[in-house]
Structures are given as C-alpha cells and as structure tokens.
Amino acid sequence: KTALQNKNFRQALNFALDRTSYSAQVNGKDGASKTLRTLLVPPTFVQADGKDFGTLVEEKLAATGDEWKGVSFADAQDSLHNADKAKAELAKAKSELQSQGVQFPIHIDYVVDQSSNALVQQADSMKSSIEASLGKDNVVIDVQKLSTDDADNATYFAQSPDQKDFDMDITGWGPDFQD
C-alpha cells in the first residue's frame, strides 16, 4: 500500500503501461489506437481563449513537472507510455520508499475475472508492459485470476474497503454525455 500511495510510484506505473497493447487485446492491432483516449472527454470538448480543452490540460500539467512535458491529450494515441519517464519516476519513488523501509520488488495484486479471455489477456498485457518497463526486480504484477463470483464479491460487491484484499482493479467508466 505504501508504494501505491507514493505519487512518483503511481506516475512510474502510468508511464510504464502500454495502452496500445492493452487495447489490442480486445480491439485487435488495427483497432487498438482508435479506442485510446487520455481524457474522460474529447480533447476538443470545449475551448477557452481560442484553445481546445486538451491543449489547456497539456499546458497546465506540463507546468506541474518535467515528466509531463511532451504529453499530448489528442485522441487515438498513447503519449503516456514512455519507458524512460517510467524509469525516472521509479528512481525517485524507490529512493523515497526505501527511506521508509519499503522492500523491492513491490508486488501488486491485480484482480481479474478468469472467465473473460479478454480481461485476462488485458491483465497479462498490463503485467508484461509494466514489468518490462520497470523491471521485475522493482515491480511484479501478481494477476489474481478469480471466478466471476469471487471477482465480483472482491470488487463490485465489497461492502467496505476492508473487504477489498487486492491492490489494483481495472474497471470502466465514462461520461454518459459530453456535456
């Protein structure tokens, strides 16, 4: 838990994930990039001062740290996946976490419904890209393949945070309307 509460560690995971490969598990190679969106709304959703929303977000985010410079929020591309940035963020996180007594590698339990081939393939893709970018000596994604009932009970139907005995779960949500 301590590692996931560290901003630099979360940013390392963010830059380590190959979203195109992850999407290809469901949408195929040709359709993989077509579904990619870095923001919840289209980057052209609204404008202010003659600039699209995506451009405004890029500018504001780049001002928060060098790691965000060069990140584009245009649709149909993955400008977040960057192994060099992932490693740089991990180096910062590792120093901070080791000073708190955290041991490496960090093991992250990731729950997935084993009855869904697509979800299992996506979980394996996530595991592969994160471990390849950051190194298994630093981060290991432990994919927990559960039955549908067990996965639902551990995630969707858990009554309290204490009942959620995992580190990561990927679900989907998007706005119903663009306004």
Language model segments and positions:
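Periplasmic binding protein-like
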Residues: 129-179
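Append "and occasionally in soluble cytosolic enzymes with long acidic Gly/Pro-rich linkers
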Residues: 4-132
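Periplasmic-binding protein-like
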Residues: 1
